């Protein structure tokens, strides 16, 4: 996760992961930010964005706005908005040949010159979304200088960008300024990972700073607000559910998309008119006046946040039965409860007598 480490986001910042799926980098950013601030995680592929949603939910992130748009569309919505932007751009994939035979077979279809042109368009959009004084990390999984050092040379020549040198760690080596036309020594400020010299595949990472003075983000205090009358009705049903089943209070700006209720993340006061999958914390479904909690909600909470928990110890066979979606049995009070592996929530059950209705998502279940 060197790209996320190089970006070094701080709690409370506005961060964009522009090519985010399947989500490993986004979750690494989220852990560093401690669910404070905003991560806009985008992927242009509708299929890949589904995996992004699942991984964000598995990690219990609540500050993430997951979108499915082109960079060109996003730059219209977010001019000079972000403190930091991560660009793990599509590339020719030469660094993955050893690991992924399909990458080698498809190499002839993804010519390096074509990839470099796409990468430059992505950076153009990202540059317009980055605040003056903001940080951008550019990374690929290819060896080709055309997509790496030569692109960085183009960026610092054509934009108000400068290289912020990365120190080699963990088997990384300095990037190769001698492979560029200008031979500018600052172009050795990026990093390369060679698979024959270190554990891992081939990667390139470079950190860039946009020239100018950085403005601090505006302070936003806690508030309770609804984006529509329907959202307020759904939120009231959620508050009733929380009063009966939870020990914690969730406040913020509530938004209803269809029957799905969300608590919006920090800095997102309303949902812009773009294609999106998840906005902050997905609380659950509101249908026919009733609220049913989501898997996302249980993953975002701690065991002490629930009024009822069903705790399984290590090696208890009921853990596997739960993850397979099987019905469990237990003596206890009727209502919703969190199933926990020791102290870690796994998902919901709904107790009715001795029977526990398994609410673990079907798409997550073990086969």
Regions found by a protein language model. Name each.
Residues 82, 135-138, 143-262:
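Class I S-adenosyl-L-methionine
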């Amino acid at each position: 996760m060197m790209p996320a480490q190089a970006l070094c986001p701080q709690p409370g910042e506005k961060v964009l992961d522009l090519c985010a799926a399947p989500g490993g980098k986004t979750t690494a950013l989220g852990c560093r930010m401690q669910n404070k601030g905003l991560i806009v995680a985008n992927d242009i592929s509708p299929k890949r964005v589904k995996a992004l949603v699942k991984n964000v939910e598995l990690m219990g992130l609540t500050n993430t706005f997951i979108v499915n748009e082109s960079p060109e569309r996003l730059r219209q919505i977010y001019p000079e908005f972000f403190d930091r932007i991560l660009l793990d751009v599509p590339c020719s994939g030469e660094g993955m040949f050893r690991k992924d035979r399909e990458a080698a077979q498809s190499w002839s279809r993804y010519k390096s010159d074509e990839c470099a042109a796409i990468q430059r368009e992505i950076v153009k959009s990202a540059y317009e979304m980055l605040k003056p004084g903001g940080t951008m990390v550019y990374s690929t999984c290819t060896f080709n200088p055309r997509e790496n050092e030569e692109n960085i040379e183009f960026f610092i020549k054509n934009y108000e960008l400068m290289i912020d040198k990365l120190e080699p760690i963990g088997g990384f080596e300095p990037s190769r300024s001698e492979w560029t036309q200008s031979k500018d020594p600052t172009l050795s400020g990026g990093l390369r990972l060679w698979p024959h010299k270190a554990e891992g595949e081939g990667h390139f990472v470079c950190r860039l700073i946009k020239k100018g003075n950085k403005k601090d983000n505006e302070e936003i205090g806690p508030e309770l607000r609804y984006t529509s009358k329907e959202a307020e009705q759904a939120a009231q049903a959620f508050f009733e559910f929380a009063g009966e089943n939870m020990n914690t209070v969730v406040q913020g700006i509530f938004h209803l998309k269809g029957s799905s209720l969300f608590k919006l993340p920090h800095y997102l006061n309303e949902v812009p008119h773009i294609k999106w999958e998840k906005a902050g914390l997905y609380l659950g479904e509101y249908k026919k006046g009733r609220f049913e909690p989501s898997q996302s909600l249980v993953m975002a909470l701690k065991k002490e946040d629930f009024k009822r928990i069903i705790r399984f110890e290590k090696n208890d066979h009921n853990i596997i039965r739960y993850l397979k979606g099987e019905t469990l049995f237990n003596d206890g009070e009727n209502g919703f409860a969190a199933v926990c592996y020791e102290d870690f929530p796994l998902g919901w059950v709904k107790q009715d007598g001795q029977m526990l209705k398994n609410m673990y998502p079907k798409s997550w279940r073990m086969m």
